[in-house]
Amino acid sequence: MNKQASQPRAIYYVVALQIWEYFSFYGMRALLILYLTNQLKYDDNHAYELFSAYCSLVYVTPILGGYLADKVLGNRMAVMLGAFLMAIGHLVLGASEIAPTFLYLSLAIIVCGYGLFKSNISCLLGELYQPEDPRRDGGFSLLYAAGNIGSIVAPIACGYVQEEYSWAMGFALAAIGMLAGLVIFLCGNRHFTHTTGVNKAVLCARNYLLPNWGWLLILLVAAPLLITVLFWKEWSVYALIVATAISLVVLAKIYRQAQTAKQRKELGLIVTLTLFSMLFWAFAQQGGSSISLYIDRFVNRDILGYSVPTAMFQSVNAFAVMLCGVVLAWLVKESVSGNRTVRIWGKFALGLGLMSAGFCILTLSARWSAAYGHSSMPLMVLGLAVMGFAELFIDPVAMSQITRIDIPGVTGVLTGIYMLLSGAIANYLAGVIADQTSQSAFDASGAVNYAINAYVDVFEQITWGALACVGVVLLIWLYQSFKFKSRALAVES
């Protein structure tokens, strides 16, 4: 085997942890909107609001998580601490079936754990490569695709356990998965000795009467309580506004920190990619909310007398990501010629185009439901699979570019900002979009027809919105291609 072409051994432990984190996070996510509407009897508006608030805040905390990793914890310790908190949160969520007051607290604990984990797992992977290592893109595609093994199995396993036993057991299974991933990761600890560890000097330094480790403990207790209040009072939108304002200030600081035109150009590319990623995910995140309730209410899920649990459909998207991601990871080493910026915009155009095609298929499904009362399952599966394939041309490309930037000490923060816009703001926008399909009652036939037509309208609008984004990205791609060819001709002459 060519050792230069093979991936670092440490990547397999990172991938294993990612698999189980996906299992934990997406197993719970597949159940959450259904739990709120079917078990806790929230109306659609309330369920969408809480679901989008949760999905938004899990992407706000990576900014703080990235900062703590860069300055104090290091990526490895931040990832381990985040995994532990997420497992605790899922266990508490299971108890909310008995005591609903635990609902907000459990979601808050998961949000804090996710903040420490999500941005720093990618940065930890980035530490395994040199900046221009040709294996880097393949490693990120492998991480993204292999992680989806967990998100394929999770909706099936958690959905089945919930259906056969209870909601609490479904959430507990998600917690067990996260703990299993943490144990596996700890077994490979010796392969990460060259990565950044805990900054003991900063951790032990005193600030305002207490050492920093004391302030860190206070933060770990206070943050979940504060986020619980945000859920309870429905103040999450204000948190997003504050986080966005802080991020703009941080971006301006990083821009001033850039010392060369090349660094400023790289930062500008990352910001532009982030904005298009935000729009992409505002569309894609319908999968856990409006699409999930659409499947639950208007898709014929019967196979030979067995009704497929709605949560299991979340596996379709993940299966498409994994299958196509493995192929892309193999092909990427054959596609390293030409200008990198041109390739990036070409991939983004393809990803947004596939998202538009996926929602076009869902629009056909919704029209079928409007005509016949229920849509066919194969059409739904096809649409979800196309949307899953689209993901491979967005996040791995953007994350790889962020970890490549040549400005010291900013990758964690930039990753957190990327998560804020493409995750938090995108999920808030996704909630606004999903709310257009809300219906509190489906008893009268008129209400049912109205609900189906609402899904038709929303899915069709997303189709055209994604297509418009493709047009803009293609213009950028053509401009970059022309500029690259002009420079090549100038060099030859």
Curated annotation (Swiss-Prot):
TM segment ranges: 14-34, 49-69, 91-111, 138-158, 167-187, 212-232, 235-255, 267-287, 312-332, 344-364, 379-399, 413-433, 458-478
Protein localization: Cell inner membrane
Record has Membrane as a keyword: yes
Keywords linked to the UniProt accession: Cell inner membrane, Cell membrane, Membrane, Peptide transport, Protein transport, Transmembrane, Transmembrane helix, Transport
Main localisation: membrane
Gene Ontology molecular function: dipeptide transmembrane transporter activity; peptide:proton symporter activity
Membrane-topology descriptor: Multi-pass membrane protein
GO biological process: protein transport
Protein's UniProt keywords contain Transport: yes
Gene3D superfamilies listed in its UniProt record: MFS general substrate transporter like domains
A single Gene Ontology CC term: plasma membrane
Biological role stated in the UniProt entry: Probable proton-dependent permease that transports dipeptides.
Family: Belongs to the major facilitator superfamily. Proton-dependent oligopeptide transporter (POT/PTR) (TC 2.A.17) family. DtpD subfamily.
Family matches, as PANTHER family: PROTON-DEPENDENT OLIGOPEPTIDE FAMILY TRANSPORT PROTEIN, RESISTANCE PROTEIN MDTM, PUTATIVE-RELATED-RELATED
Protein name: Dipeptide permease D
Source species of the chain: Salmonella paratyphi C (strain RKS4594)
